[in-house]
UniProtKB/Swiss-Prot annotation:
Lineage, uppermost ranks: Bacteria, Bacillati, Bacillota, Bacilli, Lactobacillales
Native organism: Streptococcus thermophilus
Protein name: Phosphopentomutase
Keyword Metal-binding: yes
UniProt cross-references to SUPFAM superfamilies, sorted A to Z: Alkaline phosphatase-like, DeoB insert domain-like
Family, per entry: Belongs to the phosphopentomutase family.
């Protein structure tokens, strides 16, 4: 009999809570990450009002300087701590894979200055189409088609771009480059990015339609990921016949491995919360685990170094938290965490190497307080412990602390 019949894990993408001990080994535009602090700097510079997360214990998480505008609760309703990453990376896939129990000792490659000429030339030779060199850098997916879509419509050239994560994305107007052709080109790109110096987590086909000034991306997106290099706790749950629900890009991050119910991509954080609540209130979801990623913090505000937008996005999630809690059953456990930092006040535009917050709440709790500081993979070890399956490579369960 599981202590918690259902467990729900929400990753607030990039919501770090202060520089990790090894942060100075990671850099942003030449500046070490040692002074990064996503939540701390948002709270200090633009104010942060998240009463529902504060009630669970967000302001109680141990820090050298308390969060300026998030007070500690004398009697929180949940358990709280912060967790440290052991893997050699600060990207989305590394963070999520470690949360699910893997230790990534060979990080994926990211391309802040765009992909090397060798890769672009191989794609050109395979496809018979030229690549627009000016788009070959980290780019917003909507901005890149606004900037280069008109040219693509005239020339048929490929729009290839990347992001802070280890991904290669190809945008193609469906009337100019048919979707099936785009998929073939992406499959070729996948075949040449499976090992270093270009080990990429995902190749993403990004079809779009419309006219200049009014382009829209279509639902024909396709992700060509790589599977985790070892079984994760998702795999262990799936093998044991336990329901696993994915909300947002979780299924992409794990290449579908270990997931038996995919609620689809999120159009926004609010849409993701809607999808999570839909899963939680489904008649079919009686026992098991849901895993949600809410990416707007990172994609819309962290990389763009927009602390006000990031703060507002946190406020928006906090306002929805009571709805999520209302969808819980008595023996459910809700866990809220992150996958890395992305301090919107920091140098550069990359992720930041930080501790992640961890909050846990159940209507069945008889107590509350702090859990000892641990590591990302402790989350999956706790999930495995609860459902009676093996943990993955690393992680120590804190299930016995949740009472």
């Amino acid at each position: 009999m599981s202590k918690f019949n259902r467990m729900h894990l929400i990753v607030l993408d990039s919501v770090g809570i202060g520089a990790a001990p090894d942060a100075n080994n990671f850099v942003n535009a030449g500046v070490p990450d040692g002074a990064s602090d996503t939540l701390g700097h948002i709270s200090k510079t633009v104010g942060l009002n998240v009463p529902n997360m504060a009630k669970l214990g967000l302001g109680n998480i141990p820090r050298e300087q308390p969060l300026k505008t998030v007070p500690a609760e004398s009697n929180p309703t949940g358990y709280a701590t912060k967790l440290e990453e052991v893997s050699l990376g600060k990207d989305t896939m590394t963070g999520h894979w470690e949360i699910m129990g893997l230790n990534i000792t060979e990080p994926f490659d990211t391309f802040w200055n765009g992909f090397p000429e060798e890769i672009l030339t191989q794609i050109e030779e395979f496809s018979g189409r030229k690549v627009i060199r000016e788009s070959n850098r980290p780019y917003s997916g909507t901005a890149v088609i606004d900037d280069f879509g008109p040219r693509q419509m005239e020339t048929g050239e490929l729009i290839i771009y990347t992001s802070a994560d280890p991904v290669l994305q190809i945008a193609a107007h469906e009337d100019i480059i048919p979707v099936e052709e785009l998929y073939r080109i992406c499959e070729f790109a996948r075949s040449i990015t499976l090992e270093r110096p270009a080990l990429l987590g995902r190749i993403i086909a990004r079809p779009y339609v419309g006219e200049p000034g009014n382009f829209t991306r279509t639902s024909n997106r396709r992700d060509l990921a790589i599977s985790p290099f070892a079984p994760t706790v998702l795999d262990k749950l799936n093998e044991a016949g336990i329901d696993t629900y994915s909300v947002g890009k979780i299924s992409d991050i794990f290449n579908g491995e270990g997931i038996n119910h995919d609620m689809g991509h999120n159009k926004s954080n609010n849409h993701g919360v809607d999808n999570l609540i839909k899963a939680m209130t489904s008649e079919d979801f009686k026992h098991g685990f849901s895993f949600t990623n809410l990416v707007d913090f990172d994609a819309l505000y962290g990389h763009r170094r927009n602390p006000q937008g990031y703060r507002d996005c946190l406020h928006e999630f906090d306002e929805r938290l009571p709805e999520i809690i209302a969808a819980m059953k008595e023996d459910d456990l809700l866990m809220i965490t992150a996958d890395h930092g992305n301090d919107p006040t920091y140098a550069g535009t990359d992720h930041t190497r930080e501790y992640i917050p961890f909050l846990a709440y159940s209507p069945s709790f008889k107590s509350s307080g702090l859990i000892p500081v641990g590591h990302f993979a402790d989350i999956s070890a706790t999930i495995a412990d609860n459902f009676g399956v093996e943990k993955a490579m690393i992680g120590e369960s804190f299930l016995d602390k949740l009472v």
